[in-house]
Amino acid sequence: MCDAFVGTWKLVSSENFDDYMKEVGVGFATRKVAGMAKPNLIITVNGDMITIRSESTFKNTEIAFKLGQEFDEVTADDRKVKSTITLDGGALVQVQKWDGKTTTINRKIVDDKLVVECIMKGVTATRIYERA
């Protein structure tokens, strides 16, 4: 199910992330620090629980969830959101909702790379990770 995602991933490229963070409402100083961070993602599966841990010089975050079940999340920029993650066509699709706003984060494996698309209104950031 999600086995292809399991492992440690390092960020190798990031496109349009500052514009995405701006659209989300992240402040200037936080955007500058977060934009320079090169996070590692550690993804594990234990039964029906999936854990995604992000480790960087900016901040460490971790979410643990079951597919299709809403959970509370505090994001790296300290937004308190309701998240739901589903598996759709081999992609992990995360929808975050807060204060009447919605953003979508799609994670998929393409050519053994983890491609993460962050979408807010008309702005899309693409971040590519390789296995560490």
UniProtKB/Swiss-Prot annotation:
Subcellular location: Cytoplasm; Nucleus
Amino acids binding a fatty acid: 127-129
PTM: The N-terminus is blocked.
InterPro entries: Calycin, Fatty_acid-bd, ILBP, Lipocln_cytosolic_FA-bd_dom
Subunit annotation: Monomer. Homodimer. Interacts with PPARG.
Motif (Nuclear localization signal): 22-32
Full protein name: Fatty acid-binding protein, adipocyte
Major localization listed first in the record, in broad terms: cytoplasm
Similarity comment: Belongs to the calycin superfamily. Fatty-acid binding protein (FABP) family.
UniProt keyword annotation of Acetylation present: yes
GO CC terms: cytoplasm; cytosol; nucleus
Alphabetical list of Pfam families matching this protein: Lipocalin (PF00061)
Annotated keywords: Acetylation, Cytoplasm, Lipid-binding, Nucleus, Phosphoprotein, Transport
MF term (GO), any: long-chain fatty acid transmembrane transporter activity
Notes concerning its domains: Forms a beta-barrel structure that accommodates the hydrophobic ligand in its interior.
Annotated positions of the Phosphoserine modification: 13
Tissue/organ expression: Adipose tissue.
Residue positions where Phosphotyrosine is found in the record: 20
Function: Lipid transport protein in adipocytes. Binds both long chain fatty acids and retinoic acid. Delivers long-chain fatty acids and retinoic acid to their cognate receptors in the nucleus. Involved in the regulation of intramuscular fat accretion.
